Swiss-Prot record:
<dbReference type="GO" id="GO:0031966">
    <property type="term" value="C:mitochondrial membrane"/>
</dbReference>
<dbReference type="Pfam" id="PF06413">
    <property type="entry name" value="Neugrin"/>
</dbReference>
<feature type="region of interest" description="Disordered">
    <location>
        <begin position="155"/>
        <end position="270"/>
    </location>
</feature>
<feature type="region of interest" description="Disordered">
    <location>
        <begin position="26"/>
        <end position="48"/>
    </location>
</feature>
<comment type="function">
    <text>Plays an essential role in mitochondrial ribosome biogenesis. As a component of a functional protein-RNA module, consisting of RCC1L, NGRN, RPUSD3, RPUSD4, TRUB2, FASTKD2 and 16S mitochondrial ribosomal RNA (16S mt-rRNA), controls 16S mt-rRNA abundance and is required for intra-mitochondrial translation of core subunits of the oxidative phosphorylation system.</text>
</comment>
<feature type="glycosylation site" description="N-linked (GlcNAc...) asparagine">
    <location>
        <position position="186"/>
    </location>
</feature>
<dbReference type="GO" id="GO:0005759">
    <property type="term" value="C:mitochondrial matrix"/>
</dbReference>
<feature type="modified residue" description="Phosphoserine">
    <location>
        <position position="41"/>
    </location>
</feature>
<dbReference type="GO" id="GO:0061668">
    <property type="term" value="P:mitochondrial ribosome assembly"/>
</dbReference>
<dbReference type="GO" id="GO:0003723">
    <property type="term" value="F:RNA binding"/>
</dbReference>
<dbReference type="GO" id="GO:0005576">
    <property type="term" value="C:extracellular region"/>
</dbReference>
<comment type="subunit">
    <text>Forms a regulatory protein-RNA complex, consisting of RCC1L, NGRN, RPUSD3, RPUSD4, TRUB2, FASTKD2 and 16S mt-rRNA. Interacts with 16S mt-rRNA; this interaction is direct.</text>
</comment>
<keyword id="KW-0221">Differentiation</keyword>
<keyword id="KW-0325">Glycoprotein</keyword>
<dbReference type="GO" id="GO:0005634">
    <property type="term" value="C:nucleus"/>
</dbReference>
<protein>
    <recommendedName>
        <fullName>Neugrin</fullName>
    </recommendedName>
</protein>
<feature type="glycosylation site" description="N-linked (GlcNAc...) asparagine">
    <location>
        <position position="268"/>
    </location>
</feature>
Length: 291
């Protein structure tokens, strides 16, 4: 029994001595406080790294879950195009030349689209043909309600092609200048097209009217049999009546003109006028004018 007790006491003493040795080492060792270092302090940086990794993995899982839910809610396939090819080229140029000032959120705000659309544009390397560009731009502009601006894309300015045959023009194109210009900046172009069409349709009517006027003038200049004693009056009046009819007025000689003729030829001029059908003569038989 004594042996066992001595062994137990010896073991306790050794343990106490070892503890005292660790304590003395901790006191004598370098350190500002002089206390025993915490063994868990060596694991703090590793725990922080593990926590950061766990948080990043958690965020990634949440993002993946959000993407899955959004794909299920959205329609299948690519989203509808809302940008023209010119706008997409401008987005790529700005992001490539000025990446700091034109970031993805800034581009999305400037072009009024989502950030996903900007990322799709930046990732895409597809180069379509000119026909494909025009076709896709036409769809985009039709959805945006700007079909009239296709003339700027084609560069030809042939706006008459945009108006098919028999197309009824809306009332907004025929509004007064100030009101139409405030609502539609391209109303002048549409009015020009309409005016050109109406000019073409009215051209035959104008030609017929002019031909009729010329025919009337030719009939008015048909020589009339006058007395041989007065060729001078006939020649003079024909030259005088030619000037007002040449202007296209078609008016009859005024009273002032008749007074001038009377003053020039007082002997041969008579104030009495005789009507024979559509022709008018004086009392001496001289031809005056025709209706």
């Amino acid at each position: 029994m004594a042996v066992t007790l001595s062994l137990l006491l010896g073991g306790r003493v050794c343990a106490a001595v070892t503890r005292c040795g660790f304590a003395t080492r901790g006191v004598a060792g370098p350190g500002p406080i002089g206390r025993e270092p915490d063994p868990d302090s060596d694991w703090e940086p590793e725990e922080r790294e593990l926590q950061e990794v766990e948080s990043t993995l958690k965020r990634q899982k949440q993002a993946i879950r959000f993407q899955k839910i959004r794909r299920q809610m959205e329609a299948p396939g690519a989203p509808p195009r809302t940008l023209t090819w010119e706008a997409m080229e401008q987005i790529r140029y700005l992001h490539e030349e000025f990446p700091e000032s034109w970031s993805v959120p800034r581009l999305a705000e400037g072009f009024d689209v989502s950030t996903d659309v900007i990322r799709r544009v930046l990732k895409s390397k597809f180069l379509p043909t000119l026909e494909q560009k025009l076709k896709q731009d036409q769809k985009v502009l039709k959805k945006a309600g700007l079909a009239h601006s296709l003339q700027h894309l084609r560069g030809s300015g042939n706006t008459s092609k945009l108006l098919p045959a028999g197309h009824s023009v809306s009332g907004s194109l025929l509004m007064p200048g100030h009101e139409a210009s405030s609502k539609d900046p391209n109303h002048s172009t549409a009015l020009k097209v309409i005016e050109s069409d109406t000019h073409r349709t009215n051209t035959p009517r104008r030609r017929k009217g002019r031909n009729k006027e010329i025919q009337d003038l030719e009939e008015s200049f048909v020589p009339v049999a006058a007395p041989l004693g007065h060729p001078r009056e006939l020649q003079k009046y024909s030259s005088d009546s030619e000037s007002p009819r040449g202007t296209g007025s078609g008016a009859l000689p005024s009273g002032q003109k008749l007074e001038e003729l009377k003053a020039e030829e007082p002997d041969n001029f008579s104030s009495k006028v005789v009507q024979r059908g559509r022709e008018f003569f004086d009392s001496n038989g001289n031809f005056l004018y025709r209706i």
